[in-house]
């Protein structure tokens, strides 16, 4: 999994859900700087955080990390 692809997908999904970095961070019990680091490809979340992100965004883990195209069911 490429950090850059995850970051692009995460930012796209977050923005489609009209969520700020701070709002997403709050749902995950993280700092906003962590979300920023994930989105710009400087940090990689652990599997539990990835799982929670996918649940919040209503997508599969494969869709979040870029292994599968995002489904229309995700509302994106």
Where are these regions (language model features)?
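A short, Lys/Arg-rich alpha-helix, primarily the initiator
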Residues: 1-16
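DNA major-groove recognition helix of helix-turn-helix/homeodomain DNA-binding modules
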Residues: 48-63
């Amino acid at each position: 999994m490429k950090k850059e692809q995850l970051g692009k997908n995460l930012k796209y999904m977050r923005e489609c859900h009209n969520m700020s970095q701070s709002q997403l961070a709050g749902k995950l019990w993280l700092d906003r700087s962590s979300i920023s680091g994930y989105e710009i490809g400087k940090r990689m979340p652990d599997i539990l955080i990835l799982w929670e992100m996918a649940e919040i965004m209503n997508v599969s883990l494969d869709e979040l990390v870029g292994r599968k195209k995002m489904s229309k069911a995700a509302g994106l």
